[in-house]
Amino acid sequence: MTNGPRSTRATRYPDYDVLDKRTTPSWDEHTRAVIADRLATPLEPRFFNAVEWLAVTSLCARVVPQANAQPVVPLAALLDARLAGHSNDGYRDARLPPMRDAWRIGLAALDAECRERGGLPFASLAQDTQNALLGEMQRGELTNPAWRGMPSKLFFSERVLHDICGLYYSHPHAWSEIGFGGPANPRGYVRMYLNRRDPWEAVEARSDTHEHAAKENRRVR
């Protein structure tokens, strides 16, 4: 199985690709299977309807912008897959409805807020306008009846940020960006000291060590 194109993301770990570990002792078969499944996430929605899909795709792009990142973490697809599979955290704030309901209500309310102000849905707004609206959500200033009693501030913190950011950093492309080697099972991590690293960990580049770090990272397995 090929790893696809190497990441061109801006990172302090140049030329590091965690997927190079796929066939090494860093990952066991269970880890490989989990990562393969994550990389194969369907890009077409199974939970969200067409209107919700447009809204959540735009929302993900504002929470974690990836305009200059390749390859892109498919955030909306990962969220859709989680909801379609009835996966949840196993707990929730009592002021929020169940996860699937919260997302349906939240996206509908977000579009309702936008249409009330200018007649357009969230996905059709300029990015600056979208950002301003999300700022209002973060402060709990969105109170359209479409929220159905769910606090917009709580939806922002407990669903929007929690789910989208969590899904981003669950993906191997994001691991490569931050120099994370994944579960490292069964190999593990050994040199647990300040400024020490195992040979199978990524090398962080300093201002004068970019080429050295890139060379080392191409050999990391």
Regions found by a protein language model. Give the residues of each.
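Ser/Thr-centered flexible coil motifs
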Residues: 25-28, 49
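A short linear-motif detector with a strong N-terminal bias
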Residues: 26, 42-43
